[in-house]
Amino acid sequence: MKKTILLAWVGIGALCAACTSSNNTSVVKDGAGNELFVAHYQEIKDTVVINLSDLVEDYELIRFEDNDSALLGFRVMPTITEHYIGVSQRRGQPYLLFDRQGNFLCNVGNVGQGPGEYAWQIYDAAISEQKGEVYLAQFAFSPKIFAYNLQGKLTREIETGCTLSKPKIEMDDEGNLCVVQIPMPSQKSLNLAIQMDGSGNVTRTLKAEERFWMDDFNGDLFAYHNVPEFSFHITCCDTLFHYDRTENRVVPKYTLDFGMMDEKPGHIYNEIPGYYMTTVFGKGIILTDKQKCTSYYVKFINDLYGGISHPVTFKDGYVFTLREPTHWIHYIEKRLASDDCSDTDRKQLTELLESIDEEGNHLMFIGKLK
């Protein structure tokens, strides 16, 4: 029978111990010293309740500016830095730039066919505060990454040397840009990875093995930028990989073993410091502890805001929830209706509920990961 375990953590470090074997997780080592973690899906039974205060070093609730230019749509995906939040929306809408107080700064470029305009939805973005630039990569069909200043004006077009398909981009501390994309023979683009220097010159490419090839756009590439390594998951290859920039190679790091299941559930891999993570559609989130070599389902509780429970995303070294006001009202009212809501939590949540404008723009809980 599945059981739920409540851990009172001092912090993430409290779970770090010598690696021990478990019945639900294996580690496969190759001759080069790499470790591949394999979590055995059908053996994962327990659920651990984790307070968000154990994961973050600071947190805030951001109320995005409420005007027609700044309104956010459904299922938006932010790019987060210390001082900025960029938001990619559905096709036909420009990329929006905000400061960390939620103030709308500008549209970054615009939708269209002209110079510096993008015809397709922005699939990924990077923001360099050091260089004062925002980098936008379109969904597909373009061999360029557009660079804009923090006022939203085009500064340069970075040629990647091939047409990109669902690219993910990262910039290191030295200003070097790295792209990982889905290789598609139909698009005559077989590079899996492309490295560029700070001036935008291509310095290295990595041709994709056939296992990474896709014939159409029915799959996806996921990269959440939470760890120093370029950690990514292409859905046609059921493994989370690291792209090693120095060695110019990909290294398998994590996968779920579904055994003899006739139909595997849909799932997405992610990685945060100390853990691999799998979102299993219709089932929940699995964490695999790299130190303890064990896996379990996890339920996150926002003890920083009255113990409410809400979906969370881990990206760019942060944990966040970005939702419309009606969603937040639902989360709060559900918690207020629970029997175990303390007087302290009830007071905090009631004040928060009264401060929310149901017709306003999105609210974002955000915490920086330890």
Q: Could you tell me what each predicted segment is?
A:
Residues 16-18:
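C-terminal motif of bacterial Sec signal peptides marking the signal peptidase cleavage site
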Residues 24-63:
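Blade/loop signatures of beta-propeller domains
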Residues 36-37, 83-90, 132-138, 175-186, ...:
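Short beta-strand elements that form the blades of beta-propeller/WD-repeat-like
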Residues 42, 47, 59-93:
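Beta-strand-rich domains and repeat architectures in extracellular enzymes and scaffolds
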Residues 65-75, 103-131, 138:
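Blade-loop segments of beta-propeller domains
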Residues 73-77, 119-125, 163-171, 213-222, ...:
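Repeated scaffold domains used in trafficking and secretory/extracellular systems
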Residues 119-122, 139-189, 206-209:
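Asp-box/WD-like beta-propeller blade repeats and closely related beta-sheet repeat scaffolds
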Residues 251-271, 292-317, 329:
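Conserved blade-ending motifs and adjacent loop-strand segments that build the rim/top face
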